[in-house]
C-alpha cells in the first residue's frame, strides 16, 4: 500500500522501498525488525483467537469483535510483513502475477476489516454502558457474529477493486532486471481510492470513536452508578440477602464496586487499542495524503520503513495490551500455555462444591472481564484440591 511512488514506477504493497537504492544496512535492519515484530504479533494474535474460542466464559460480544480484529491483524502481518522480507532479500518481487493480486488484496482486506472491527466494538461499548437496557437485546453474542460477517463481507467486496488496478512492473537495468508488484494505471487514477480509504477506514472511525468514548467517559467515570432500574443497588442487596443471608450480605458492596471497576477497566483497555490504532497509522495515512498533492512523491527509504514498522506494531501490540490490562485474558493466556505443557499428564479426578455469586449487570453481555465472585471459604478449600486445568474445562 503505497502512494509514495511516481507514475513511472508505481509500486504497491505496504510501502515497499525502491529496492535498487537500498543499502545492506537497510536490508539487515528491515529483516530483523519485521521478523521480530511480525513473529511476535502472529503468535500473540493466534493466542487471542484460541483463548476466546476454547474458553466458554470468554465468548462475549466484545471478545467476538476482538477475535475479528486479531484475524485481521494476522492477515496484515502475514500478507504485508513476509513479502517485505523477501523483497529485502531478493530486491525483486518473487510471487508472480497471482501473488501480486492476492497478497495486495489480503493486505487491504486485513486493514479495512481491522478498522471496522474497532468501530464495531466501540459502538458496542457505547450501547452497553450508556444504554444498558437496550444492551440486553442489542449486545448479544449472536448479533455480534452477524455484524462481523457483514463487516468482512463488505470489506471483501470493497477490496476487490484492487484486482483491476494491479500488474507486474518490470524495470531493466544494465546488470539486472527488477520485478515489482505495482499499478497498471497512473497515479491520478488510484490516488482518489487512497483518499476514499483514508476517509472511510481512518477519519470516520476515529471521529466516531472520539465522540463515543467521550460519552462513555462521562457516564462511566463521572457517574459510575448505572441508571438502569434493574441495577439499583438496594434492590440487588435485598434479592441477594434472601438467597444467602450469611455469606452474601458481607460481599454486596465489594461485589458491586468490583463490577464498576471491571466496566471501567474493559473500557480503558479498548480505548487504548483505539488510541494506538490512531497514532500508529497516522504516519502512513499522512504520507498518503501529502503525496497525493506532490508532483514528485516523498519516498525516503528510512521513513517508509518507519511507517511500515508502525503498521506492524499496531497489528502486533494488541495481545500485549490484553495481557497487561485484562485479568481474564492474562489468566487465559497462562492456561493456554500450561495446557500445552501438561497435555500428556492425566489430571487427577476431583469434586469440589463451589458457591458462585454472579453479579448481573445490564451490560454483562459484553464485558470480557466481568467478575464472578467466589466466597472466600470455598475458594480457600478449592485451591488445595484443584490443579491447573486446560481451557476447555472452564467451570
Swiss-Prot record:
Membrane side Extracellular: residue ranges: 1-30, 86-101, 171-195, 291-298
Gene Ontology cellular component terms for the protein in this record: plasma membrane
Disulphide bonds in the chain: 100-181
Keywords linked to the UniProt accession: Cell membrane, Disulfide bond, G-protein coupled receptor, Glycoprotein, Membrane, Receptor, Transducer, Transmembrane, Transmembrane helix
Side of membrane Cytoplasmic, spans: 54-63, 124-146, 218-268, 322-395
Gene3D superfamilies: Rhodopsin 7-helix transmembrane proteins (1.20.1070.10)
InterPro entries in UniProt: GPCR_Rhodpsn, GPCR_Rhodpsn_7TM, TRH_rcpt_1
Topology with respect to the bilayer: Multi-pass membrane protein
Cellular compartments annotated: Cell membrane
Iron-sulfur among keywords: no
Gene Ontology molecular function: thyrotropin-releasing hormone receptor activity
Predominant location category: membrane
Transmembrane portions of the chain: 31-53, 64-85, 102-123, 147-170, 196-217, 269-290, 299-321
This protein's record includes keyword Glycoprotein: yes
Sugar-modified residues: 3, 10
One GO term (biological process): phospholipase C-activating G protein-coupled receptor signaling pathway
Main function: Receptor for thyrotropin-releasing hormone (TRH). Upon ligand binding, this G-protein-coupled receptor triggers activation of the phosphatidylinositol (IP3)-calcium-protein kinase C (PKC) pathway.
Family that this chain belongs to: Belongs to the G-protein coupled receptor 1 family.
Protein name, UniProt field: Thyrotropin-releasing hormone receptor
Amino acid at each position: 500500500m503505497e502512494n509514495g511512488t511516481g507514475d513511472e514506477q508505481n509500486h504497491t504493497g505496504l510501502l515497499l522501498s525502491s529496492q535498487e537504492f537500498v543499502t545492506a544496512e537497510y536490508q539487515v535492519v528491515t529483516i530483523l525488525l519485521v521478523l521480530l515484530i511480525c513473529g511476535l504479533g502472529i503468535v500473540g494474535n493466534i493466542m487471542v483467537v484460541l483463548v476466546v474460542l476454547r474458553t466458554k466464559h470468554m465468548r462475549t460480544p466484545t471478545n467476538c469483535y476482538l477475535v475479528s480484529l486479531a484475524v485481521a491483524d494476522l492477515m496484515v502481518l502475514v500478507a504485508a510483513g513476509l513479502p517485505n522480507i523477501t523483497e529485502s532479500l531478493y530486491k525483486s518481487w518473487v510471487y508472480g502475477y497471482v501473488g501480486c493480486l492476492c497478497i495486495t488484496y489480503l493486505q487491504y482486506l486485513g486493514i479495512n476489516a481491522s478498522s471496522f472491527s474497532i468501530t464495531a466494538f466501540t459502538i458496542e461499548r457505547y450501547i452497553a454502558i450508556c444504554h444498558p437496557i437496550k444492551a440486553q437485546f442489542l449486545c448479544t453474542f449472536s448479533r455480534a457474529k452477524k455484524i462481523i460477517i457483514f463487516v468482512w463481507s463488505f470489506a471483501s467486496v470493497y477490496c476487490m477493486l484492487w484486482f483491476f488496478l494491479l500488474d507486474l512492473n518490470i524495470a531493466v537495468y544494465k546488470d539486472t532486471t527488477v520485478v515489482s508488484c505495482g499499478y497498471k494505471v497512473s497515479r491520478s487514477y488510484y490516488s482518489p481510492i487512497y483518499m476514499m480509504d483514508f476517509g472511510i477506514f481512518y477519519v470516520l472511525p476515529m471521529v466516531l470513536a472520539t465522540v463515543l468514548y467521550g460519552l462513555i467517559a462521562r457516564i462511566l467515570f463521572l457517574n459510575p452508578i448505572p441508571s438502569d432500574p434493574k441495577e439499583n443497588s438496594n434492590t440487588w442487596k435485598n434479592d441477594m440477602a434472601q438467597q444467602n443471608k450469611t455469606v452474601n450480605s458481607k460481599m454486596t458492596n465489594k461485589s458491586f464496586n468490583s463490577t464498576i471497576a471491571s466496566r471501567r477497566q474493559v473500557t480503558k483497555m479498548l480505548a487504548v487499542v483505539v488510541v494506538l490504532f490512531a497514532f500508529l497509522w497516522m504516519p502512513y495515512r499522512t504520507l498518503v495524503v501529502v503525496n497525493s498533492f506532490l508532483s514528485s512523491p516523498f519516498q525516503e527509504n528510512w521513513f517508509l520503513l518507519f511507517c511500515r514498522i508502525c503498521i506492524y506494531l499496531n497489528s502486533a501490540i494488541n495481545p500485549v495490551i490484553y495481557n497487561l490490562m485484562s485479568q481474564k485474558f492474562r489468566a487465559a493466556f497462562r492456561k493456554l500455555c500450561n495446557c500445552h505443557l501438561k497435555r500428556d499428564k492425566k489430571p487427577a479426578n476431583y469434586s469440589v462444591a463451589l458457591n458462585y455469586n454472579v453479579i448481573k449487570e445490564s451490560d454483562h453481555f459484553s464485558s470480557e472481564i466481568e467478575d464472578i465472585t467466589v466466597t472466600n471459604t470455598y475458594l480457600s478449600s478449592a485451591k488445595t484440591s484443584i490443579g491447573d486445568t486446560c481451557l476447555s474445562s472452564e467451570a
